[in-house]
C-alpha cells in the first residue's frame, strides 16, 4: 500500500466556463459525486492511502471548505497552496518535496475514472519504478491528441509526447502516476517547454525516460474522461448515465384541470412504463383528482396559478431520476416514451416536436397556422442560442423529459406560471450549457374541452407573444 497520495486541484478551469464560474472544476459532480471525491475514494479504497495532499490554488478555500480535513472520508487531508498556478502542474508538485520521502501515487483532480482497476498499481509499491504512468487503449485518436501519447517496449515507456499531432499507436496517457521522490530533482533539471514557457510534467517524464529512468506503463480498465472543456463534462455525465441507465427511476408528472374525460386513459397508458405518476390538479370540479387516485397516481390537489405552477408542484413531489412531463388530455402516447428515454442517454433534456406532419393524427389541434407558428418561434429560440447549435422546430410541445439533476440546476430560475413554462425550461437548460435533443412524437386529438391557449388564432398569438417575450428577456439577461 501507499501511505501518501496526491491530487493536484490548483487549476482555474477557465476552459470549462460557465460550469466553473462559481464552482472549482474538481468539485463538479458526475453521478451525484464530485470528481475530487471520486478520486479520493480511488486513492483510499484501491491504493490504501491514509493521507492525501491536495495542491490548491484557484478557489482553494472553496475546496478546503467542501472537503475539510477528511475525517468524514476516512482519510487525512492536508492542503498545500500553490501561489503561482500559471507555473503548471510540475512546479506544483515541488511543494511536496519536504513532505514525501517514498513512492507516492498522483491522480489529477479533473479526471473521471469509473469502474477502474487502480488497485493493480499496488504491485509498484513492492516493485518500485521511477515513474508509473496510467494508460488506456483507445481507438479514439481525438482523446490522445487532448492528452499525451506514449511509446512502449513491453511495459516500459521509452518516450512521451504531450498533445501529439501524429498518432503512432492507440495508447492514451492518463493523469494517474506513481512517482519516486527522485521526481523532484527531475522536475528541477528539466528546462521550460518551448511551447508553453513552463516546465511540463510530460516533458519531465519523457526527458527522464530517455536518460534511462525506469518508466513503466500500467494499463487502466474501466471508463475514463479528462475534463477540460464543457463538451468533456457533458460527455462525462452522459457516460455515467449510460453505465447506470437501467438503475434509474422514471417519474411521469401531469398538470390537470378538468381532465376527467382523459386522465384515466392517460394513466392506464403510462402506468406500466414508469415508476411513479404524479398528478398536480388545480382542484378540478369534474372529479379529475378522484379518477387519478383510483388509477394509482399520486395526486396533489390544491389551488394552482396555471400550467407552469402545476408542473413545478408536480416536479417538486417527483422522486425519479428522469422526470417526464406531459398533458393529461391524451394528446400524447406512451408508445413514444421508449425513444424519448433512449435519447436521454445522450442529453440533459429531450423534447418532442409535433410539427412532423406524418405524425399528426387527423383531428389533432395542429393546423398549418399553429404548426408553422411553432416552427417560426422555435427557430427564433434556436437563432438566439446559435453558439450551442440547438435544433428546434416546436416551441410549445409539452411532452418532454429532463434529468432530475438538470432540473434542480435550473429550478430556481423557473417562474412562468402559464404555458410559457415550456420554452422557459428550454431557455434555462441552454443557459446552463446543457444539451437538448428534439425528436418527433405522435400528436393525437385532445380529449375534453378546447385548449384556451391554442384553441383559436387569437389565443395562439397571445400565447406565442408571451413565450417570445420571455425568450428575449432571458437572452438579454432579464428575469
Model regions and ranges:
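Short, well-formed alpha-helical segments that are part of the catalytic scaffolds
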Residues: 34-43, 256-273
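Conserved core of the sugar-phosphate nucleotidyltransferase
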Residues: 114-195, 355, 371-380, 398
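Acceptor/aglycone-binding surface of glycosyltransferases and processive sugar-polymer synthases
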Residues: 146-155, 303-305, 309-316, 334-419, ...
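Conserved N-terminal catalytic core of the sugar/cofactor nucleotidyltransferase
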Residues: 1-7, 15, 29, 33-107, ...
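Catalytic-core segments of class I nucleotidyltransferases/pyrophosphorylases
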Residues: 123, 153-225, 230-234, 402, ...
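Conserved beta-loop-beta/alpha segment of the NTase-like Rossmann-fold superfamily
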Residues: 64-152, 321-354
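N-terminal nucleotide-binding beta1-loop-alpha1 segment
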Residues: 1-21, 241-254
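Hydrophobic helical membrane-anchoring modules
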Residues: 210-214, 218-250, 269, 342, ...
